[in-house]
Design a protein with these regions (language model features):
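Internal alpha/beta domain cores that form substrate/cofactor-binding pockets in large enzymes
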Residues: 6-30, 34-62
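Donor/substrate-binding cores of folate-linked one-carbon enzymes
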Residues: 38-160
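A structural preference for short, pocket-lining loop segments at secondary-structure junctions
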Residues: 303-308, 321-367, 378-391, 415-419
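Crotonase-fold acyl-CoA enzyme core
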Residues: 385-387, 391-400, 408-495
Length: 546
């Protein structure tokens, strides 16, 4: 939102408020024309909202009339088809102030597993919030007064809802799998659903499961949902996730959290939990969009365009995930029918780089950091040296590692709403992913230095303007994917495809590869020093346990 307002020449100052006194001081000291509170989590002090000279607005993630701190949670729980964002005047009574604007949106997902609270926030809610705030600012500029909340108006559908409690988020495994998955998604990524698992004898294993929060629900729609077991029993594991029996069907959970540390669910096997220590692995072949949990899959079009999806939780790529992705990329490379390879990343995040949570849990975090950065570098090398035409399609946001990985493709496109963070500075890292080669090659050395040193996010459209991306388009994921599909099909046509392949062969000749690998070696030399620096380890801890 701040980036969109800045793009429109508004002077924006962003502040994270921890105490009411901070907000009071800022309002008095800065004297802004407008105070904007997006998705508020703390009550606004009376000294601020009662100041008639400075309007104070709340951006509430709910339809007109909706009130309460669990708006999105209840919308997902109730399986609403339509929801919205409302900009309202801050007032003594929570979310009951006069209304400046409201924007509604449809809740539609082709893959129901992607419909989490955090996903709704970063996609539909954020887009509606930007539109609503811009309309509200226009109303303010034109002297249009806000309207009072009027529950007697039949068009006002929202109501005051209570805050969700731990009881609302506690899983009863006797329920059907789709209801349990909905319960997990409405709490993901914060605060998480609560669950106790059961042993094969049907007794609760409270000693092990008592403190766990559950994340990353995926409905099992294949034959595994018929595996025998008692509700709450863990039936199997795959790629970090655990399959749990429900009253009807089964659901995968990808992550569990305890003591503020969220990890791939199967990493808790190391605790020696009797419930799951002997759980069997449930392998799966790569192919079209799965009816089960699968974080890497491919699909091929009749004209030879292969879409490679790697939908890792929050975009973090562990060493093992990188190795699995490399395996798939090599399979695609060996497929002569494939002419164009499109890297799709995940629905909400293309990639955020190395997996800081897994690193934090490692016996030797410095060594795991080294393993992880080398593994993601190998992914980048696979992309750059591919003999296919390669496209990176950023449907969602991307952190430093993900941005730099995308630059290794022949073409990098993004959805208009995507936000990129092309820097490593806040994690006290020099960075790798061959960024010292690909970033200056695209934007020039001066701009590369600016992006890395500023440590600020950039909108996809701005990234395209400076040459970081080759283009951006699409208000939503469906429009963007359709456009990318068209571009890829165009490139796959025989004359064009042969032209680009010849061009690529020149690009990866021996002397160029020597330069590229020298960049990697220099980056890793700096990263090796970073991984021994206490500043990095503290920054990582702050991120993981925030």
């Amino acid at each position: 939102m701040a980036l969109e307002l800045t793009k429109r020449q508004h002077n924006i100052q962003v502040n994270e408020i921890n105490e009411p006194s901070e907000m009071i001081h800022l309002a008095e000291h800065v004297q802004p024309d407008l105070i904007l509170c997006p998705f508020l989590t703390k009550r606004i002090p009376e000294e601020v909202y009662s100041n008639v000279r400075i309007p104070c607005w709340i951006v509430h993630p709910g339809i007109e009339g909706d009130r309460g701190a669990s708006s999105i949670d209840w919308a997902l729980y109730d399986r609403e088809d339509e929801w919205g964002v409302t900009v309202l005047q801050a007032a003594e009574e929570m979310d009951a102030g006069d209304i400046w604007s409201t924007k509604n949106f449809q809740i539609r997902r082709r893959n129901i597993n992607t419909l989490t609270k955090s996903s709704l926030y970063v996609n539909e809610v954020t887009q509606a919030a930007v539109e609503a705030v811009l309309e509200a600012i226009e109303n303010l500029s034109e002297g249009t007064s806000p309207r009072p909340l009027d529950y007697s108006n039949p068009r006002v559908r929202g109501t005051l809802r209570s805050n969700m409690t731990k009881v609302d988020r506690s899983i009863n495994w006797e329920m059907p799998a789709d209801e349990i998955a909905c319960q997990i998604r409405m709490s993901d990524s914060s605060p998480g659903a609560h669950a106790c698992f059961r042993t094969s004898q049907g007794t609760e294993d409270n000693k092990w499961t008592k403190a766990f929060r559950v994340f990353g629900a995926h409905l099992e729609k294949g034959k595994l949902r018929f595996l025998p077991g008692k509700p709450g029993e863990i039936l199997g594991q795959r790629h970090g996730s655990l399959l749990v029996k429900c009253g009807r069907g089964a659901v995968w959970v990808s992550h569990l959290k305890r003591d503020k540390l969220k990890l791939p669910a199967n990493m808790w096997l190391l605790t020696g939990a009797p419930t799951i220590k002997d759980v069997s692995n449930l392998p799966i072949r790569y192919g079209s969009h799965p009816n089960t949990f699968q974080d890497v899959w491919t699909s091929m079009t009749p004209d030879g365009v292969c879409f490679v999806h790697f939908d890792f939780y929050n975009g973090a790529m562990s060493t093992n995930q990188c190795k699995r992705l490399i395996s798939v990329l090599r399979q695609v490379e060996e497929n002569d029918f494939c002419k164009v390879m499109v890297l799709m990343g995940g629905n909400d995040v293309f990639s955020n780089g190395i997996h800081l949570n897994v690193i934090e849990a490692a016996e030797d975090p410095a060594q795991e950091s080294w393993n992880n950065i080398n593994a993601i570098n190998d992914v980048v090398r696979c992309i750059f040296t591919s003999k296919k035409i390669t496209i990176s399609a950023l449907r969602g946001n991307a952190g430093a590692g993900g941005v730099m990985m995308a630059l290794a493709s022949d073409f990098a496109f993004a959805r208009e709403a995507a936000v990129l963070n092309p820097h490593y500075k806040k994690m006290k890292l020099y960075g790798s992913e061959y960024h010292t080669y690909f970033l200056p090659k695209r934007v020039g050395q001066d701009k590369a230095n600016e992006l890395l040193s500023n440590a600020e996010p950039i909108l996809a459209c701005e990234a395209a303007e400076v040459g970081l991306l080759d283009g951006c388009l699409g208000d939503d994921a469906e429009e963007f994917e359709s456009w990318v599909n068209h571009q890829a099909s165009f490139l796959a046509r025989s004359p064009l495809q042969m032209h680009f392949v010849r061009k690529k062969n020149r690009k990866v000749r021996k002397e160029v590869m020597e330069t590229v690998e020298t960049c990697r070696a220099n980056e890793l030399s700096m990263m090796a020093q970073n991984f021994q620096d206490p500043e990095y380890h503290q920054a990582r801890k702050n991120f993981v346990y925030h």
